[in-house]
UniProtKB/Swiss-Prot annotation:
Principal subcellular localization: mitochondrion
Purpose: Electron carrier protein. The oxidized form of the cytochrome c heme group can accept an electron from the heme group of the cytochrome c1 subunit of cytochrome reductase. Cytochrome c then transfers this electron to the cytochrome oxidase complex, the final protein carrier in the mitochondrial electron-transport chain.
Protein name: Cytochrome c
Keyword hit for Ubl conjugation: no
Length: 108
């Protein structure tokens, strides 16, 4: 399938509006309600040091990349049943692509 190309600036706005209340992205950023996302591309689910994940998240065992994140962000509770993340998801493919484009840049 492949993830469509996203717009970093639109993704940043989405992050601020929909994600920043629970997540940080900068190196050394604090965990909030959700984990700091720095360096999460290429990491397995439930692996950010110092964050208390649900058993479901730890057990999922997938590696975060564009494709897995694209599917997850559409409906987190469907992708990882039992996740603590209360976010309902982004139904529009272009919004998910924009957010992923931003996260790829912001979490390096």
């Amino acid at each position: 399938m492949g993830v469509p190309a996203g717009d970093v600036e639109k993704g940043k706005k989405l992050f601020v509006q929909r994600c920043a209340q629970c997540h940080t992205v900068e190196a050394g950023g604090k965990h909030k309600i959700g984990p700091n996302l720095h360096g999460f591309f290429g990491r397995k689910t439930g692996q950010a040091p110092g964050f208390s994940y649900s058993d479901a998240n730890k057990a999922k065992g997938i590696t975060w990349n564009e494709d897995t994140l694209f599917e997850y962000l559409e409906n987190p509770k469907k992708y990882i049943p039992g996740t603590k993340m209360v976010f309902a998801g982004l139904k529009k493919a272009n919004e998910r692509a924009d957010l992923i484009a931003y996260l790829k840049q912001a979490t390096k």
